[in-house]
Structures are given as structure tokens and as C-alpha cells.
Amino acid sequence: MSAAVVATLPTLLLLLGLAAADCPSSSWVQFQSNCYIFLQTTVKIENIEDVRNQCTDSASGADMISIHNEEENAFILETFKKRWKAQDDILLGMFYDTDDESFKWYDKSNMTFNKWKNSEESQDLIDTCGFLQPKSGIWKKGNCEVSSVEGALCKAAVSYEKKYLPDHHILITALVIASTTILTITGAVVWFLYKRNLTSGLTNTAYTTAPQLPYNDDCILVDAEENEYVA
């Protein structure tokens, strides 16, 4: 039975590992199906791509922040209050597309939500970036040509396995696979022992000595002589 348990450990550890691997590392914070991190280092930049590189280099599939609803914006604001520290406005992962005159997210997700200040007036938006005010959660427009930023706010989607296979499903799957493997290996061991004992029994039977006659050669000779004398 111990061999069966050992045999299931790699599968069990792999599945439980998936359950623990919500985000790229413990430095990231998960909200719904995404992970977030604020890389709090002052970065001298020439353009927004330098900030974006901080995110794309931090984890596979990561990019600058995109925000799609009030709940996500509130989560970002709350996390800045409790965990992240920032005084300056934070660059959002958006750019102004002059072809269709609209803002777009760098991660190519749809622009379905905004939190612009009510006082924002239409203006020449070429080289305009979006900024998040970490204390209010309000967005504002500003020139992309900034010499430095306080940090990079990054976002990465939770892996497919975690997004579509929740923790309790992973645990149940792990237990089912482990139990099935243990039963299979145990059954194989029992069958092997049964076959070995059966083969051993047949071998012993084949080598059993033949039954001896009730008389040995000397007795037969004496009986023959007595019969001859009587005759």
C-alpha cells in the first residue's frame, strides 16, 4: 500500500500546486480572475514603453494596468491604501489612438469603463496618457512625456487552469485521481500475489512423491517363498 501512495504523490503534488499557483508570486494580489502588482521603484523613462517593459518583464502575460469596471477600480484604490504606497499619479496602460480618436488599452482589451474627472475638457490628445490618482481613484489625462514615474502598476490574467478549475474542484480531482491510482495499484499487487501463490501450489503438487506400496521388496520375496513352501 505504501508503494501505491508514493506512486500517486507526483500527480497529487502537481494538482495541489495548481491550486496554490494563483498568481506569478506572493508579491502579486489577486482580484477575481486577475493578479496585480505595483512595482514601486522610481524609473527614469523616455516614453511610456519604458514603463510598460517593467510590467511585461515582471511575469509571463503581464502588461500595464487596464481597468474595466467600478469594482476593479475600487479594488485598486483600496489596495493602494492598505498595501501599496504611492504619492504621485500612476500611469494607466492606455494610449490615444489618433486613427479612430479614442483611448485604447495596451493589453488589447476593450475600453468599456472610465473614471475621468468631470472637468476634463476636449483638447489635443496626441501624446496624451491616462493617469490614476491613487488617493481618489479618479483618472486624468496628461502628457506622456514624463521624465520619471514612481512605479509601474501591472496586471496579469490568472492562468486558464485556475480560472476555469476552482480550488475545490482541483482538490476533489486530486483526491479522485489519488484514490483511483491507489485502488488500481493495490488490485494489481493482490492479483500478482494470488497468481504467484497459485503457481507455487501447482509446482509443489507436481513434485509430490508417488504413494508407496504397502510391502517392500524383502516382504514380497518372503511371501513368495512361503507360498512356494506351502504348495
From Swiss-Prot:
Pfam families according to UniProt: Lectin_C
Membrane topology: Single-pass type I membrane protein
Main subcellular localisation: membrane
Cytoplasmic topological domain: 191-231
GO molecular function, one term: carbohydrate binding
Domain C-type lectin per the UniProt entry, residue ranges: 31-153
Signal peptide start-end: 1-21
One GO CC term, this protein: cell cortex
Extracellular compartment residues: 22-169
Compartment(s): Membrane; Cell projection, Filopodium; Cytoplasm, Cell cortex; Cell projection, Microvillus
Function: Potential multifunctional C-type lectin receptor that may play roles in endocytosis and phagocytosis as well as in cell adhesion and migration.
Name of this chain's protein: CD302 antigen
Organism phylogeny: Eukaryota, Metazoa, Chordata, Craniata, Vertebrata
